[in-house]
Amino acid sequence: MNLNSIPAFDDNYIWVLNDEAGRCLIVDPGDAEPVLNAISANNWQPEAIFLTHHHHDHVGGVKELVEKFPQIVVYGPQETQDKGTTQVVKDGETAFVLGHEFSVIATPGHTLGHICYFSKPYLFCGDTLFSGGCGRLFEGTPSQMYQSIKKLSALPDDTLVCCAHEYTLSNMKFALSILPHDLSINDYYRKVKELRAKNQITLPVILKNERQINVFLRTEDIDLINVINEETLLQQPEERFAWLRSKKDRF
């Protein structure tokens, strides 16, 4: 299996998995044009589309792709049924695509119906988890997003986190504002800054490394707890997560 990233809009990534036979899976195609160009250039045969949630920058290209390739099966949560989904999937179910089983994980928070797809080592997490951050809460609560992030953080160490946006640099600037002396965060920030200066992608990331540099995955970390306690005493990791998300919203 080969993993490919296709840039779209200002900072989106559309992920494509293809096998040796050229069959491919497309994840969150917000725009059809760059996907069609990649399909043509690589002689891919699209078999399926995965949708994580209903926002237009993730579903906008579905109609055109299905018109061009009517054999495509479009998997997605209930909230995407009017966006072109032909196979609604929910938490605990599996999608069998390209000879692989993808587990469906409910991750409410960014939207109420948001889902992720996992087949070792690939995690397609839409707008739930970003490198160095997490998605904004447009529909869900901090408690829901905390539980969603916790689920993803429990996946195997070697999981490849395939996020849908290039937000890494801004996320790491926020992380530095919270933990300015953290060595892992500083090292990763420098690496990301160099990559972005060359207009290079920072994704995918390995989950084991992400747990070290993503403050939203470190709500039980003593260094972070000490920083938060300087401002307010919060007893539960869930409360600390909400504090971080509120800070990030205003950053």
Swiss-Prot record:
Binding of Zn(2+) 2, residues: D57, H58, D127, H165
GO biological process: methylglyoxal catabolic process to D-lactate via S-lactoyl-glutathione
Catalytic activity: an S-(2-hydroxyacyl)glutathione + H2O = a 2-hydroxy carboxylate + glutathione + H(+)
UniProt KW keywords: Hydrolase, Metal-binding, Zinc
EC top class named in words: hydrolase
Cofactor note: Binds 2 Zn(2+) ions per subunit.
InterPro entries on file: Clx_II_MBL, Glyoxalase_II_hydrolase, HAGH_C, Hydroxyacylglutathione_Hdrlase, Metallo-B-lactamas, RibonucZ/Hydroxyglut_hydro
Function: Thiolesterase that catalyzes the hydrolysis of S-D-lactoyl-glutathione to form glutathione and D-lactic acid.
Name of the protein in its database record: Hydroxyacylglutathione hydrolase
Lineage, opening ranks: Bacteria, Pseudomonadati, Pseudomonadota, Gammaproteobacteria, Enterobacterales
Gene name, Swiss-Prot/TrEMBL: gloB
